[in-house]
Amino acid sequence: MSEMLKGIAASDGVAVAKAYLLVQPDLSFNKTSVEDTDAEATRLDDALAKSTEELQAIRDKAAQSLGEAEAQVFDAHLMVLSDPEMVGQIKQNIQDNKVNAEAALKEVTDMYIGMFEAMDDNAYMQERAADIRDVAKRILAHLLGVTLPNPSMINEEVIVVAHDLTPSDTAQLDRTYVKAFVTDIGGRTSHSAIMARSLEIPAIVGTKEITDKVKAGDILAVNGIIGDVIIDPTDAEKSEFEAEAKAYADQKAEWDKLKNAETVTADGKHVELAANIGTPKDLEGVHKNGGEAVGLYRTEFLYMDSSDFPTEEDQYQAYKAVLEGMEGKPVVVRTMDIGGDKELPYLTLPHEMNPFLGYRALRISLSELGDGMFRTQMRALLRASVHGNLRIMFPMVATLKEFRAAKAIFEDEKQKLVNEGVEVSNDIQVGIMIEIPAAAVLADKFAKEVDFFSVGTNDLIQYTMAADRMNERVSYLYQPYNPSILRLIKNVIDAAHAEGKWAGMCGEMAGDQTAVPLLLGMGLDEFSMSATSILKTRSLMKRLDTTKMAELADRALKECDTMEEVFALVEEYTK
């Protein structure tokens, strides 16, 4: 008899296949006394080396199949493995207490995990606890000679079922064989869900009990569009899901026909659909999906993929490659956004209780520590500007004083290059990322001095709602459609237009099919998203009338008190 479970729709698509249970191995061990502590330390070093090699391979594969943005999660894991303080404490534990490496590892990592988890009001520390837990599990497996699940070995069509999928699990999924995945826990903004959308694998998370209900080999029918899973579907249900899968495949084929088309609404208004990228390699996805621009080039990956500060020439070559690759189409380059969850092994930053609200991004660039890095980046960008349509964007701007200071450095380096006889473009737009509520509220003042705005909704929502989207205990407050968020976005768009400037968006909300009608109605000029969302969004835009969507946005802003009311109104206007 079939049974239906409801979960969170995390990645679109429909699939019917047998279940493959991703079961975690038994990593239990006995604490033992040892005489040869040097031998135990050597065992630990071997396990660390194997873990590093594995994670580096997984990271490289993730960068290739998912892009640098999704691969960066593994940088935090690699930094845990090379943390001299933690590794030193484990070895000291072996030496002082004459215990086996397994026991020393568990004692030290449990101490760190407990310490970070105790800071339950600090999302950054919660994430560090999760990183250490994942890495400790991998090291322990090597110490015990136990093989961790390897999803990359799956060689038949299956639907992966797990309590949760770590980023390393998800990055190893081969979409040739893995038709979908379903988990007990997780949310739409979890790392595994974001990776699933990049891989274009249907996914449902947060079912609470899928692993209790399913056995290996059970047939599952998954609809990642609405969040339904049927266990052991009847022939009729199976046929229905297979028909839905075909309909979805046909729909995707229709979207593919729009690859070379401009994005035009039902009433003839052109809207720019751009892509977010992390490296020049990501341009392949932009072209494959018909991107009209690069709306966000995350330059921090140049720094994160290097063992030392990238030189001016290294940066120039990367920026040149992207600008030339886009053949005159706009490229918005975000200056270095280091700090928060993005650390560099060769840049020592002060320890902070909450790095997300601390010393990061433009705050580093404008400091004595970051001045040289920032000026080098400005020179590389200015030199590359002659190869395409460059736009420069400063992240984490809270005050006009910060923008003016950054713009002054840009002008200073530009003049130096001109004096050196180096050709630079005189048509470079300079704008800011709106991700701090203070900047959104003062958008009318900023608009007089910037050339454009790009709304970074991921952080804007977190900072406005005081809720970390990766923290499941408060994730219900991560509300892109909360009227307060919509009002801030509308304020930014109106402020830009009042000064004859353009406003874009580069957060996940820009590619959200529920948000697009609202944002179009508010007058957003540019939507920048994961490249895989572009064709679907272009198809939606073709069906939307800007006058009708403006009415929708106006009503949402004036009449709605809650996120649920906004949802209902959007459904009324788009059904």
Swiss-Prot record:
EC number in record: 2.7.3.9
Enzyme class: transferase
Positions that bind phosphoenolpyruvate: R298, R334, N458, D459, R469
PROSITE patterns the record matches: PEP_ENZYMES_2, PEP_ENZYMES_PHOS_SITE
GO biological process: phosphoenolpyruvate-dependent sugar phosphotransferase system
Subcellular location: Cytoplasm
Keywords in alphabetical order: Cytoplasm, Kinase, Magnesium, Metal-binding, Phosphotransferase system, Sugar transport, Transferase, Transport
MF-aspect GO terms: kinase activity; metal ion binding; phosphoenolpyruvate-protein phosphotransferase activity
Domain of life: Bacteria
Entry binding sites for Mg(2+): E435, D459
Database matches in SUPFAM superfamilies: Enzyme I of the PEP:sugar phosphotransferase system HPr-binding (sub)domain, Phosphoenolpyruvate/pyruvate domain, Phosphohistidine domain
Keyword Thylakoid attributed: no
InterPro entries: PEP-util_enz_mobile_dom, PEP-utilizing_PTS_enzyme, PEP_util_AS, PEP_util_C, PEP_util_CS, Phosphohistidine_dom_sf, PTS_EI, PTS_EI-like
Required cofactor(s): Mg(2+)
Active site positions, chain numbering: H191, C506
Gene3D superfamilies assigned: Phosphoenolpyruvate-binding domains, Phosphohistidine domain, PtsI, HPr-binding domain
Catalytic activity: L-histidyl-[protein] + phosphoenolpyruvate = N(pros)-phospho-L-histidyl-[protein] + pyruvate
Transmembrane segments: none
Comment field (misc): The reaction takes place in three steps, mediated by a phosphocarrier histidine residue located on the surface of the central domain. The two first partial reactions are catalyzed at an active site located on the N-terminal domain, and the third partial reaction is catalyzed at an active site located on the C-terminal domain. For catalytic turnover, the central domain swivels from the concave surface of the N-terminal domain to that of the C-terminal domain.
Comment on protein domains: The N-terminal domain contains the HPr binding site, the central domain the pyrophosphate/phosphate carrier histidine, and the C-terminal domain the pyruvate binding site.
Function (record text): General (non sugar-specific) component of the phosphoenolpyruvate-dependent sugar phosphotransferase system (sugar PTS). This major carbohydrate active-transport system catalyzes the phosphorylation of incoming sugar substrates concomitantly with their translocation across the cell membrane. Enzyme I transfers the phosphoryl group from phosphoenolpyruvate (PEP) to the phosphoryl carrier protein (HPr).
Record note on quaternary structure: Homodimer.
Record-stated family: Belongs to the PEP-utilizing enzyme family.
Protein name, entry field: Phosphoenolpyruvate-protein phosphotransferase
Species of origin: Enterococcus faecalis (strain ATCC 700802 / V583)
